Amino acid sequence: MGYWDNKQSMAAQAAAHTHQMMLNYEKETTESVKNSKIYYSKDGINNVREPAPTTCHSAVELWDKDSVTAARIACTEHPDSKICILNFASYKEPGGKFIQGSSAQEESLCHASNLYNILLRFDKVYYASHREKGATNRSLYYNEAIYTPNVIFSNNKFDVLTCAAPNWSAASRFGVSLDENNKALKSRIEFIKSILEENKVDIAILGAWGAGVFGQNPATVATYFSEEFYYSSISTIVYSIPDKNSINYRAFKEIIGGNCL
């Protein structure tokens, strides 16, 4: 099967999955939407509570697993823990290119859950403004996110934090310097941590956020995550990066270390 045939097949699966989620979980989807919260920190205005100072250290794990598998393993090992998956999100489109047949991390989350049905409900109040001309901050985007509780992943429910990393691949073409990009990346990771702590997450499923098509340096991402989450009320940080031979996995292993699975 060629690339386009496979993409068409994935698009058909995405459409069928979305319809099935609507039939099976419309009530649960509506409840998750109602209990979701949009976070922002822009132009000196923010609605994220400053985390209380802590001297606690999180346990750090590096797993050769996709995000959903990692969350399920964590749930099996710690069934009473609150688990949140970081969605490596598109800034402009709910579910990224899920419905067009793409299969990056966000799209994979949508294929495994009712997340796409949830994010569609935010198109007008969240994504539409991001698609307006001049709204992308030269593709660095802004510190904006959606925290959604109880997203259904088959027999499990996990919270999902939807947040786009700065898009260095695009930003570099708009005259953005590497220093500007790194400053935005570090600020966004601080933003993510504050949201996770505000929502009293026990286990956060993170990863090589932004180090795919967005072009972030995985070593830089790993360094900023390691620095920012050094002290945290979150008990366990799982960096979920499929393929131990990948550049991303090797970068995280060198910088973060932790228990490897």
Task: Tell where the protein language model's regions lie, with residue ranges.
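Macrodomain-like recognition of ADP-ribose-binding/processing modules
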Residues: 1-261
